[in-house]
A protein has these predicted regions:
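Long, position-biased, composition-driven segments near the start of the mature protein
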Residues: 1-373
């Protein structure tokens, strides 16, 4: 916090004047009842019927017709084949289900196997998914960034890429994307376990009977980035949430403690006294106390080495030669190729990052001989 109307959640941040912000303040919860209530409960309406969840995580209304259709699709004609089990679900089970939903096409079955002490077979499924990687086309033109590929001619495989900070920022920005936004970008076809089915289930459930509102439905289907998570080199269009403004309070006592809380319609009414402000949050990617978005995650200018499996390290002549030695690739087998990365390539990189261990090779399609020439 400083006297120029800005605050930061991080230590040693500099304000506009260049000085380190060193006044501590305690963050308080908002007092607006509406904003507090919005975070309570779930996405589904209270009193709604039970739901039917299939093994591949399709969520459907718990109607008899849906149940019979599911059994028919599974070729189960005799009800005597069915067995009922009750399962307790705690934090450990939720984590297992989350992991299974990302990697397995039958996560509920896999979860039961794990509960019974079976071995984890999901790695094989992940490899099979990578083999069926499909390309995703962009919907509009976008800016481009250059990337130099170093290719093994004999293996027709990308060994590594040489990039500037723009491409490194692009890759790191993938880590900030909400899962729902990733599925939206990929058109609900991520090939990632069963999450595509979950995404489709939310689309199919109506706000008349099941989901609480269109706003909450949109929150699941099109979640926004957290404030300041977007970067200047982000080729993919994911909307960023706006950063709230804050009010500053003093307890009016000799020790003079300071408090801040998000600015809402009721924030000026507080037992702490009259609020001062507004204050704006500093963009953590800014070195000069800016409160606007943008910026990048890595320092520039710099060069980075990106492996086929998307391991990003600082580039140096020694590191690249050492890496070729580890791969046992002779220098005479290495060719160079400069490619352009736009929205379409960024979409395919995002998809490959989720399901492939050879992302660069898969995206830039080295079976196309024009890339190797």
């Amino acid at each position: 916090m400083d006297g120029r109307g800005i605050l930061s959640e991080f230590a040693n941040v500099r304000c506009h004047c260049g000085q380190v912000m060193n006044q501590l303040a305690t963050m308080l919860e908002p007092v607006d009842a509406a904003s507090c209530d919005q975070g309570e409960g779930g996405f589904l309406k209270g009193g709604a019927d039970r739901f039917l969840v299939s093994d591949d995580l399709r969520v459907m209304p718990g109607l008899s017709s849906q149940c019979l259709m599911l059994l028919k699709n599974l070729s189960i004609m005799d009800a005597k084949e069915l067995e009922s089990q009750s399962m307790n679900i705690g934090p450990e089970e939720i984590l297992q289900l989350l992991r299974s939903s990302l990697l397995s096409k039958t996560p509920l079955t896999h979860w039961i196997w794990l509960k019974q002490g079976a071995s984890d077979l999901m790695e094989l499924e992940l490899n099979n998914m990578a083999e069926s990687l499909d390309k995703t086309s962009a919907t509009s033109d976008s800016k481009k960034m250059s990337l130099k590929l170093f290719i093994s001619k004999s293996r027709e495989q990308v060994l590594y890429a040489e990039s500037g900070e723009d491409f490194a920022d692009l890759l790191f920005s993938f880590l900030t994307f909400p899962l729902g936004s990733i599925l939206k970008l990929l058109g609900g076809k991520s090939l990632l376990g069963c999450v595509d089915n979950l995404y489709g289930s939310v689309k199919d459930l109506s706000t008349d009977n099941y989901l609480k509102s269109d706003e909450l439905k949109n929150m699941l289907l099109c979640p926004k980035l957290a404030p300041f998570f977007a970067c200047e080199n982000q080729l993919l269009h994911v909307e960023e949430s706006s950063s709230p403004q804050y009010l500053l309070y003093s307890n009016g006592k000799p020790n003079n403690k300071w408090f801040v809380r998000p600015l809402t319609t009721e924030s000026n009414v507080s037992s702490l006294g009259e609020g001062l402000g507004p204050l704006s949050m500093v963009n953590p990617k800014s070195s000069t106390g800016e409160t606007t978005g943008g910026g990048g995650y890595v320092k520039g200018p710099a060069k980075f080495m990106v492996t086929d499996a998307l391991v990003v390290t600082q580039l140096s002549p020694i590191s690249s030669i050492s890496f070729l030695g580890k791969l046992d690739v002779p220098i005479t087998d290495v060719d160079e190729k400069v490619v352009q990365v736009g929205e379409e390539e960024a979409l395919n990189l995002l998809k490959a990052a989720l399901i492939s261990e050879t992302a660069l090779t898969d995206v830039f399609n080295l079976t196309d001989k024009s890339v190797l020439e």
